[in-house]
Amino acid sequence: MIRCALLGAAAILAAACFNKGDYKNEYNTHLLIAFEPDYEYEWEEFVNTFFDGGKDTVACSPSIRIGPVYHFSKLDEAEDFLGGICLARGKDADASAGRKPSRFAVFDAKVGDQGSRAYAVFHDTTAAQMPEHTIQILIPNETSSCAAEFAYVHNVQAAVQAAVHGTGLAEGPFQAGDYLKLTITGTLDKKVTGTKEVALIDGTSYLKEWTKVELTDLGKIDALELHLTSSRADFPLYCCLDDMGYYYQEIYE
């Protein structure tokens, strides 16, 4: 099972007695969604699910569930990844000229955040109709809720390569004003609760390590919508995600 860690005082059971003998059960949990197995013995089976992306670095499915959180992607008839979220485990911190860029390798000497061995890759595309949501959280009833807390983001090697050396499609290196931007939008009952923008590449500057993004301003959510935009046409719209934190509250009355 892919890791969904419980942080802090993970579960609190509250029983309150009233005049009518009513009570409620309340579970308050900090969830950490890490895109790798819980246990070492599961690693080999996990690795065997990887394919595509060069050197067996990618695993994809129309829906990847980790705890109560679903991560969606779009596949073609041959089950090749078209867009959305997939899992990856490659790394490449070399963006020198002539390097063959990888769309799925994180631009880092290590792999995931905190040195983990896997992470997620998000790809935004208009080439295929994407799922309704990028990430959706299972909320069991009307009294329960979830709030996004944070996520760690990073660049893929192909994006850095294209920004530093150009795309090879009559597009030169990035200059002032050029960008690759990730937008994370929280929604609840299909209504926007808040938006967070992250500059992955800004002119000649770009993320060189896993970077924490605070998401508490998004408020209570039941889904996250991710979008990548660039100032350049035909730019590789990919980024990496890891260690996504949520505050999850279940209340049964």
Spans of model-derived segments:
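Extended extracellular/luminal ectodomain segments enriched in beta-structured repeat modules
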Residues: 141-150, 220-221
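Terminal, low-complexity interaction segments
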Residues: 176-253
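Short coil-to-beta strand junction motifs in C2/discoidin
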Residues: 162-182
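Short catalytic/ligand-binding loop motif for oxyanion handling, primarily in non-cytosolic enzymes
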Residues: 43-44, 159-161, 233-235
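Bacterial Sec-dependent N-terminal signal peptides
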Residues: 1-4, 11-42, 248-253
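Short glycine-rich beta-strand segments
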Residues: 153-156
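Short secondary-structure capping micro-motifs at structural edges
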Residues: 131-141, 165-172
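N-terminal targeting leaders for non-cytosolic proteins
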Residues: 23-133, 138
